[in-house]
Structures are given as C-alpha cells and as structure tokens.
Amino acid sequence: MFANAGAMAFGGMTGSSRMAQSPRFSMWRPQSLDADGVAQYELADLRAFSRDLERTAPVATGAISTRSSYIVAAGINLQSRIDAEELGLTDDQASAWQSFTERRFSMWAESPFADVHGELNFYEQQELALRSHDVSGDSFVLLAGKSRQGWPFRLATQIIEADRVSNPNGRMNAGTLVDGIERAIDGEPFRAHVAKYHPGKIIPGSANEWTPIDFLSASGRRNLLHLKKIKRPGQTRGLPILDPIIATIKQLTRYSDAEVDAAVNSAALALFVTMDAEAYTDILSYEEKTYRDKKAAEWDGVINSGKAINLMPGESVSSPTPGRPNPNFDPFFGAMLNICSIGLNMPKEILAKAFNASYSASRAALMDAWRTWKIERTWLARRMCQPIYEEWLADAVALGIIDAPGFFSDPFIRAAWCRSSWCGDGPGALDPLKEATAAEKRIEIGQTTLAEEIVAYDGGDWEQKHRQRAREVRDRERDGLQVPVGTKAPTSKPLSQQEKPDQSDDPEDPEDPDSSQLQLSLA
C-alpha cells in the first residue's frame, strides 16, 4: 500500500514538473496563496478598476444596473409569517398581528428616517448595499440608534463602503487582523475597524481615525452587518463581481471607442488646400510665414467636418479607405459579450438587452437569469433585510409599539415572532397572455396557489389584492357597471341567510345554473 502511495506521490510530482517545463505554461506561474493572501495584494486595485469600469464602460454599467434592477427592483418587501402554533394564536389573531406589524414596518421602511443621514429609505438602501457589494466586493451596514423629534422609531441604518473598513494607520495584516476585520481564536469575525473618512478623501489638516465596531453587542444585538460572498474557506473580504472580466471589458471598451473614432473620421468632410512653393515664398512676409509654419507644426491631425486645411508647400495628404462602419464589428463585439456574460453568470440576451431570438429562446434566457437573481435576492434578504427587521421588531416591542409577549424572555418565542418572508418584483413577461394562461393552469391543477402566483408575478400580497378586488367587484355592481368576465359578483349576505333561487320555472332542472351567481369567485 505504501509503495503505491509513493508511486502516486512520485507520479504527481512528475506531472507537475512536466507542466512547469511545458512551453505552453512557461509564462503561467500562479502562486498558491490562501484566500486572504490574494485579496491582500490585489483587492485595492480590483476595487479601483471595477469602479472605473462601472462608471465609464457601458457593458460594466449595464451589468451592475441590471442586477440591481432585477434583484432589488422597487424593493424587497416584508411579509410577516409568524409561527401561530408556537405562539398559541388562532389564524385570525396571527393574520391581524401580521397586518399590523407590516403596516408599522412599512411606515419605517418608506421613510428617509430609516437612514442615519436621512437621505434614503430602506428600499433604496437595499439597492445601494447591493450595488456597493457588486462593485467593491463587499459592503457593510451599520445598525444605529437615532432619536428624532416626532418619530416613534429609533433604529436607523447606514451603508458603509468597503474601503472604509481597513487596518488602522495602514498596518500590515498580522495574526487575527486582516483587512480591517478581527477574528477570534476560533476564526469567527467579531470586530471591524471603520475609518472616519474614505481613504481617497483628502481633508487638509485632518488625520483619519478608526473606530472599532463589534458585529454583536454584549447583549447579542447586531451592530454591524457584513455583506460578502464567501468563495473560499477562510475568506475575510469579498471580490468585485467584475473580477474575472475586468481586462476583457477594458479592452472591449477600447476597441469600441476606436471603432467609433474611426467611423467619425471617415464621415468627416475636409478640404485640403495645397500651396505653391514659389508663391508661398514671394507673397507672404517673413512674419506671416513664421506664423503659418508654427500653426502647421501644432496641428494634431484631427479632421473636423467641413474644415478647410492649408497644407505647407510640398505637403500632400493620402488616406487609405477606412472601411467604416466595420462590418466585422458586430459579430466580434457579440462574441466578446458572450465571454463577459459567462463571467457574470448572466445570459447574453440580458446583458445586451437584445431579445432578437424566438420567444422560447428569449424566455429560456430570462428564466436562466431569474434563477440566479432569485438566489441573489434570497441571499440579500437573509443577510440584510431579515437581520434589520429583527432589530427593528425588537426595538418596536421595547418601545411598546408592537405587542409580542415573551419576545425577550424566550429565544424560541422570539424566533416565532420574527418569522417572515421577503418578496420583490417578478421577472416580467415576454408574452403576458401565454404566461397568464400558464399560471391559470398551474392553479387549476393544484401545482401552485393563487398567493404563490401573485408573489412570483410582482411580489404582491394575495390578501391585499383579494380585499381590493372584492371592493372593486362590489362597487361596480352597485354602480351598475359590468363585472369583468370570469368574476362573480360578491353577495351582500352570507349564503346561509340568502333565499334559495326560485326553481318553479324549470321543474325538470332542479339545479339552476344561475345559482352560481351567489358564489364569490376571484380569479
């Protein structure tokens, strides 16, 4: 057995040596570093590159904006789903508590007072936190207490950019301190060092200061949330999502800019005037010749449309046929977009905003992207939305705004009160009629419920839509308007108190089909 193990080890070393000696790998010498070692040497540059591309490169800007538009959209909304059985509540009591809590939370979430700076509401902070995470690699959310005159809640949050969390005074990573994050002996992150200013902010006469903030307080309350994707064991900081394709996007941007410049130059119309050498010497004075020589030397070669350009004696202009627009530009650019879309885990149709294929192909691309976005939305809800809601609920219970018996005395009861789901906008519909028909069929065969279809469509609340729909039907019937097809008018009395339909006109048919009008059916 040991002989075989030795042979395997020797064979592995031999294989490694062959690869190292191969000409194909002569320039490829990656270092085997731990997760933090890679970030230590490259993270600052990666953030700078990523931010510059997000600001100046259309492909990067579109990718980042598309993610936030679908993952967060108008906002990830709370749907309280308490454990009524654990709490000993009836369904009606649970529903009433959930509705009341959702209204109070909505009041807080829709107000800019949810922000420490009073600028962004909770849903706008979701978008900012995700965007900052995507561009910088990670982001932080500070959960602070701030009292305001006439405002019943104390919780306020603040998004902290990744660069502000760093080692104090530029200290090197050592021991348990890595890139501004302190870990305990067992490896658990327990503290972040947050700089007062962004390292790129220059304030004359002011030195930067770092404040240590524990992720959890002594009482177990959350002080700081760290939004990051862990791709390797022991990874302390996250990497920008553009990391695999930074060089590709930059080169693609340069290529597209060069093609645009070439097309503009080929479209420009300019006149070149050639002067006779003898006339140039005889007619012009020494001062004027000196001036013209100087201006000619300063010409940068830029051709403006409709411009007349004087050439010096003996000069001529020859220009090759530019061949612009380049017929090969679109196929090449599309092929490069394919590479970028793979690196971003986003279908090319979504990245390019071009649904030129068939309905089936376009829908397949949208559904493929939607699976990724659902995972990302769930991650953001678990890492940011739910922890913030739990802290808000604890504060509201402590202030007497929300009644939740046993909230602070029993962790199981507290968990039952905090149960919730988070919903956002749906992916949209390429063909609304086809997709509505499919949803109707799923409900009919029992594959899904009406509530599930509403959540998947636009993240709405079935109970709210049901109540609103019932009011609409009653009001239309009251005002003499036609009730929409497929909707039965609601009754004003319970079925048990209504008179049975008169069947005397049709004794052979005891089941009057008009009796279905007594039932409320909301499609």
Task: Give names to the regions the model predicted.
Residues 120, 143-145, 262-268, 312-313, ...:
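Short coil/turn segments at secondary-structure boundaries
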Residues 221-362, 494-496:
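Extended, charged amphipathic alpha-helical segments
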Residues 1-13, 364-367, 379-523:
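C-terminal anchoring/interaction modules
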Residues 70-230, 442:
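Structured, mid-chain assembly/scaffold modules that mediate subunit interfaces
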